[in-house]
């Protein structure tokens, strides 16, 4: 009998490793370049450039607004790191950048403590108020001639927790602290605009004078982001290009996705792990589909929505699965799909619907997220619609669709 230890040893020896730098697929990783966020970094630079003047007297404030996964945190972190370095190396100005997550530090006191810790500023053991700590921080910066940029990530959590007086103190700090040089500047990062616009006007007008919006990523932008991460994290030629196309089309905002780069990268990472587990030296489309069905929170909703489809929509979906299995391809032409649909309809003793109706069924299936469509490019004569399944080809899915078809047919009997 083979021991558990030997089984483990054999497994480790035979395992295929195609991800060489897994940390570069982590949500916390900030790469040296951020595709399609270069202009946002330039905007931040323009706002904070006055801090580089030797006689800078004023502080700056900016709101960063965008959905989760639109690159807000990574962009601000990269800006802060590079601005700090450029300020000292090229301008001889001392700038300290501090990034604070308000989900973990959602009170004025915790924020003041986190800033003090980042500055290595010793706080007396006797209890000090947050306001007193902020005054100590400013005095510390003044003595050392340092400008401080504080990025308050997930700032909405602070706004929902703190009282009006604490919010006012933080935002309008220099109404409370007398200073010739205002050394503390802020970057407020929020997911939703209403967290800012519900504030008292005296606070809102002060905080939202400058606003940088981060739109959801389009599919082409997600493709570039994923390609960059593949080059950083995977072995050469280890990820098939159609994997990147599939993930970027699934999550691209212009394709009906949420435009979330974080989930797109997570899907890529899991697809790599699935490929390694299966012993494949290359991440293939099926690995990406399996990863997507695990990660995508909408997948179960998609499957649940099948019960609401009518008979011919289900037959069309069944025809797509059958045609994909026959051709062993990842996508088929609209013509091939219609031929399979007509054949399958007759097997069920159903009159096939006309082309315009079939196209409308296809549009409905795309809206609920179970199929993808695209226009053919080079390599095909003429322009045609190519159709693919957004979920892995799975017998359980096929059986469920067949079950739903039989339910519809029996209800007619």
Curated annotation (Swiss-Prot):
Per the UniProt entry, what are the Gene Ontology biological process annotations, in alphabetical order? DNA replication
User: What Pfam families is this protein classified in?
Assistant: AAA_22, Cdc6_C, Cdc6_lid
Query: Which keywords appear in this protein's UniProt record, sorted alphabetically?
Result: ATP-binding, DNA replication, DNA-binding, Nucleotide-binding
Q: What is the effect of changing residue 72 to A?
A: Loss of ATPase activity. Loss of autophosphorylation
InterPro entries reported for this sequence: AAA+_ATPase (IPR003593), AAA_22 (IPR049945), Cdc6_C (IPR015163), Cdc6_lid (IPR055237), ORC1/CDC6 (IPR050311), Orc1/Cdc6_arc (IPR014277), P-loop_NTPase (IPR027417), WH-like_DNA-bd_sf (IPR036388)
Q: Does the keyword Repeat apply?
A: no
For binding ATP, which residues are annotated in this chain's numbering? 70-74, 217, 229
What Gene3D superfamilies does this protein map onto? 1.10.8.60, P-loop containing nucleotide triphosphate hydrolases (3.40.50.300), Winged helix-like DNA-binding domain superfamily/Winged helix DNA-binding domain (1.10.10.10)
Spell out the post-translational modification annotation for this entry: Autophosphorylated in vitro.
Q: Which GO terms describe its molecular function?
A: ATP binding; ATP hydrolysis activity; DNA binding
Question: SMART domains, from UniProt?
Answer: AAA, Cdc6_C
Q: Which family does the UniProt entry place this protein in?
A: Belongs to the CDC6/cdc18 family.
Q: What is known of its domains?
A: The C-terminal WH domain is essential for its stimulating effect on the MCM-loading activity.
Q: What does this protein do?
A: Involved in regulation of DNA replication. May play essential roles in origin recognition and cell cycle control of replication. Binds both single-stranded and double-stranded DNA, with a preference for molecules that contain a bubble, a fork, or a tail. Has a weak ATPase activity. Stimulates the binding of the MCM helicase to the origin DNA, but strongly inhibits ATPase and DNA helicase activities of MCM. Also regulates the DNA polymerase and the nuclease activities of PolB1.
Subunit structure as annotated in this protein's UniProt entry: Monomer. Interacts with Cdc6-3, MCM and PolB1.
Q: What is this protein called?
A: ORC1-type DNA replication protein 2
Species the sequence originates in: Saccharolobus solfataricus (strain ATCC 35092 / DSM 1617 / JCM 11322 / P2)
């Amino acid at each position: 009998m083979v021991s558990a230890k030997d089984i483990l040893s054999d497994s480790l020896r035979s395992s295929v490793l195609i991800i060489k730098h897994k940390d570069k697929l982590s949500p916390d990783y900030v790469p040296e370049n951020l595709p399609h966020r270069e202009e946002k970094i330039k905007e931040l630079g323009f706002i904070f450039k006055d801090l580089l003047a030797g006689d800078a007297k004023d502080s700056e404030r900016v709101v960063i607004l965008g959905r989760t996964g639109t690159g807000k945190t990574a962009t601000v972190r990269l800006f802060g790191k590079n601005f700090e370095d450029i300020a000292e190396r090229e301008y001889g100005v001392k700038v300290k950048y501090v990034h604070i997550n308000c989900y973990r530090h959602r009170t004025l006191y915790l924020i003041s403590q986190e800033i003090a810790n980042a500055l290595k500023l010793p706080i007396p053991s006797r209890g000090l108020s947050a306001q007193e700590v902020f005054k100590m921080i400013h005095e510390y910066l003044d003595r050392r001639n340092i400008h401080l940029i504080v990025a308050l990530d997930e700032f909405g959590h602070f706004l929902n927790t703190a009282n009006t007086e604490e919010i006012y103190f933080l935002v309008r700090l220099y109404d409370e602290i007398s200073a010739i040089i205002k050394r503390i500047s802020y970057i407020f990062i929020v997911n939703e605009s209403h967290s800012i616009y519900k504030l008292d006007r005296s606070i809102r007008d002060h905080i939202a004078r400058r606003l940088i919006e981060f739109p959801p990523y389009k599919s082409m932008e997600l493709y570039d982001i994923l390609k960059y991460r593949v080059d950083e994290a995977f072995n050469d030629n280890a990820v098939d290009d159609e994997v990147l196309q599939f993930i970027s089309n699934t999550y691209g905002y212009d394709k009906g996705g949420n435009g979330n780069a974080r989930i797109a990268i997570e899907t890529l990472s899991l697809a790599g792990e699935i490929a390694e587990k299966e012993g494949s030296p290359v991440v293939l489309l099926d690995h990406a589909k399996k990863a997507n069905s695990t990660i995508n929170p909408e997948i179960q909703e998609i499957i649940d929505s099948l019960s609401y489809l009518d008979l011919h929509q289900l037959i069309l979906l069944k025809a797509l699965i059958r045609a994909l299995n026959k051709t062993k391809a990842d996508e088929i032409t609209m013509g091939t799909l219609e031929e399979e649909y007509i054949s399958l309809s007759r097997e069920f003793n159903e009159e096939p619907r006309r082309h315009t109706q079939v196209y409308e069924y296809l549009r409905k299936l795309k809206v609920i997220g179970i199929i993808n469509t695209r226009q053919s490019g080079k390599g095909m004569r003429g322009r045609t619609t190519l159709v693919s399944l957004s979920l892995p080809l799975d017998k359980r899915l096929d059986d469920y669709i067949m079950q739903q078809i039989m339910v519809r047919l029996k209800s007619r009997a």
